[in-house]
């Protein structure tokens, strides 16, 4: 009865109640329950770990999962625990450990993990995958479902490792993984993880401009969601990828921001802190779209407070960088700054972008140009900001420089021409 009550509480997103009921159920099992009640122990152990994770008891959740892994009789019985373990490690900032966990599972499932992936190889993979999509995508494919459970598991873990590879390895390694996931779906039919895989790929391909119809493919991926029972944690991933990385090329920033907030709330209500990726994109979009700074500062502080409550490091650095920018624009940080500082930042691109953005609005044109140039040099490795936005502000800043300087203007003129060309492309893609 305690287990059923705990499951019902989990279904209703009442994680603390679930934690209490499931803990009571575990305490009532006999000492030899892994031998005498194996299936029950396996299920109850995993549910308890999930409830502990949702209640921010990460150490306890990890301990429970490792106990389940040690007592599980097969790899397939271990798979749910490995996935949840990788999510817990990722939330705590242990990206390498999370990556290694997913890598280990994929190797056990017969997949190969590359040490590195060259840019040219990644480009070819994307082109081949998009070509396969064009050849396969039709009503017949839409009617097919991926029946092989092992294959569905592989697609799921490829989706999990993609973002981890982006953070801890390289963009090109991440592209390799997500191309494999999408190709498996195209060859064997769609599954519940296919929409997110397609959107992850479109997010990378959109930045490389491999095809003009990528937005249409992304919309098709969204429509696939209606065929499957998708959980709140996956909804937050879908919304983050579509509205945070793709849709804002074509749809108003405000629409994207509103839907990203929905993605954040969906993740939070499901007990998953992966929704904080949506929060990062909410703030990024709000800064660029010109929301009121005072309101924006309060929203950032709200997310930072929740991160502290959830004991999570997910997107903390990115939110702190954004907060420094908003604080500097309000009063140069004199009354609005906080003690928390950015640390161990693995990607320099957001730092350079915010330095350039602050300099632009503060009137420091040379400094602004310096940091936008650094952003451009890194854009092939890390792209967290819309390239059109980078070029827009870089172009405006260069125009301001050209008004003041009459010598050494060749580079600034190139930037302006590039920005105008990019804005024409953006206007052609957008209907608003």
Language model features: what each stretch is:
Residues 8, 12, 51, 87-88, ...:
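Residue-level signature for tetratricopeptide repeat
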Residues 12, 55, 92, 168, ...:
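Structural motif corresponding to the intra-repeat A-B loop/turn of tetratricopeptide repeats
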Residues 179, 183-189, 202-293, 298-311:
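Hydrophobic, small-residue-rich alpha-helical packing segments that form membrane-like cores
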Residues 12-15, 58, 75, 95, ...:
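TPR-repeat structural position
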Residues 1-73, 77-88, 97-104, 147-190, ...:
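Extended alpha-helical scaffolding segments used for macromolecular assembly and cargo binding
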Residues 6-7, 23-33, 65-70, 104-114, ...:
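Amphipathic alpha-helical segments of tetratricopeptide repeats
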Residues 1, 90-176, 212, 287-354, ...:
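Amphipathic helix-loop-helix modules that constitute alpha-helical solenoid scaffolds
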Residues 1-2, 6, 38-41, 45, ...:
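TPR repeat positional signature
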């Amino acid at each position: 009865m305690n287990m059923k009550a705990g499951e019902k509480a989990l279904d209703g997103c009442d994680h603390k109640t679930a934690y209490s009921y499931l803990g009571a159920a575990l305490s009532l099992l006999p000492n030899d329950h892994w031998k005498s009640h194996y299936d029950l122990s396996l299920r109850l152990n995993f549910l308890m770990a999930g409830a502990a994770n949702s209640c921010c008891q990460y150490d306890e959740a990890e301990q429970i999962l490792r106990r389940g892994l040690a007592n599980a009789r097969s790899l397939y019985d271990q798979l749910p625990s490995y996935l949840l373990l990788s999510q817990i490690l990722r939330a705590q900032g242990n990206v390498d450990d999370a990556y290694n966990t997913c890598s280990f599972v994929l190797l056990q499932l017969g997949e190969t993990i590359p040490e590195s992936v060259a840019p040219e190889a990644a480009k070819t993979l994307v082109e081949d995958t998009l070509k396969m999509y064009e050849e396969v995508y039709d009503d017949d494919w839409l009617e097919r479902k991926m029946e092989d459970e092992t294959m569905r598991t592989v697609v799921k873990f490829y989706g999990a490792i993609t973002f981890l590879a982006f953070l801890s390895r390289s963009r090109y390694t991440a592209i390799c993984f997500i191309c494999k996931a999408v190709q498996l779906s195209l060859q064997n039919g769609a599954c519940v993880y296919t929409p997110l895989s397609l959107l992850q790929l479109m997010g990378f391909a959109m930045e490389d401009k491999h095809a003009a119809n990528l937005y249409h493919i992304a919309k098709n991926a969204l429509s696939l969601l209606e065929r499957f029972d998708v959980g709140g944690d996956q909804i937050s991933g879908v919304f983050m990828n579509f509205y945070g990385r793709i849709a804002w090329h074509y749809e108003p920033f405000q629409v994207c921001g509103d839907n990203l907030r929905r993605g954040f709330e969906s993740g939070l209500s499901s007990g998953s802190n992966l929704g904080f990726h949506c929060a990062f994109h909410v703030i990024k979009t709000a800064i660029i779209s010109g929301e009121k700074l005072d309101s924006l500062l309060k929203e950032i502080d709200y997310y930072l407070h929740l991160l502290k409550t959830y004991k999570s490091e997910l997107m903390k650095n990115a939110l702190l960088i954004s907060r420094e920018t908003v604080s500097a624009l309000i009063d140069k940080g004199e009354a609005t700054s906080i003690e928390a500082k950015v640390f161990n930042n693995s990607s320099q691109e957001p730092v350079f972008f915010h330095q350039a953005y602050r300099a632009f609005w503060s009137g420091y044109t040379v400094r602004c140009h310096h940091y936008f140039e650094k952003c451009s040099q890194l854009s092939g490795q890390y792209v967290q900001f819309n390239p059109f936005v980078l070029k827009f502000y870089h172009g405006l800043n260069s125009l301001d420089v050209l008004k003041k300087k009459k010598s050494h203007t060749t580079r600034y003129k190139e930037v302006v021409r590039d920005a105008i060309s990019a804005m024409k492309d953006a206007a052609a893609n957008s209907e608003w």
